[in-house]
Amino acid sequence: MKKNLSIIILLFSIMLQVAAAAGQEAVVVQSARFAPYEEALKGFQSVCRSDITRIVISELERNDVVERINKINPDVIIAIGMDALTKVKTIKDTPIVYLMILNPRSIISGEKNISGVSMHIPHERQLLVLSKVLPHVKRVGLVYDPDQTGYFMERARETAASMGIELIANEVHSSRDAPSSIKDLEGKIDAFWMIPDTTVITPETVEFLLIFSLENKTPILTFSEKYVELGALISICTDPLDMGSQAGEMANRILSEKDYAYVERTDARKEIIYINLKIAKNLGITIDDELLAGARIIK
């Protein structure tokens, strides 16, 4: 009897949420039809129960996104990517849910109407994956700008030490200094940790780092599949499709509860590991079959 009552209550709750979402509208804003953004949109569409209107900024004749949104007067705004969030964050009277953004804190702070899912993967998780793929690594190099990623680096250093790994971090304040700081790590490290620091990650620095990796047989852990395709050994990154689903769940809560102040900002709940087997072979690294089975392989 109690079990049947629980089922009835659950079904009634779902019916109320669906009814609440009926006739409501979500506006999705994205800068362009970029493949990961399209995946995120698919995930969102699969979960969100409201009507959905999409605005692609690059396809607008006039670049006044806010004016277009105000004409639609949606119940919730979905910002896919940093450019989209930058455009819509001035809107204060409509809830905004962001996704596909690495560091939302860089452009938002205490706005009560903005919540979302960041692409941040905790440093603990990244170090754990690194230690499983490369169990003999004891010294990991890192180059960072303290104004960009200083807090991340300090926390990562503490975690690495607790795992028996020494984090050797060189500080830079200009992109011009990044290559020489990487060069300074030669002979001192077993692997390099490439973090999403906008001061460090430039096309010139990435090219230098990839050459450094091959010349010194130093594997790179990075944050994006594209760098694994270019020559890094491994990346741990978010799943755009699942992030879209996560954002859709947030939007549903906002639309049904009518109180977006209680929908907290959070991190992506699922990641994907990419491994470049050609690079592993070139560096003389053998990776456990069990780890390979759970990763996406780039040959």
Identify the function of each model-found stretch.
Residues I7-Q17:
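Bacterial N-terminal signal peptides
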Residues A21-K299:
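Short hydrophobic alpha-helices and adjacent helix-cap/hinge residues
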Residues M1-I7:
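Positively charged n-region of N-terminal signal peptides that target proteins for export
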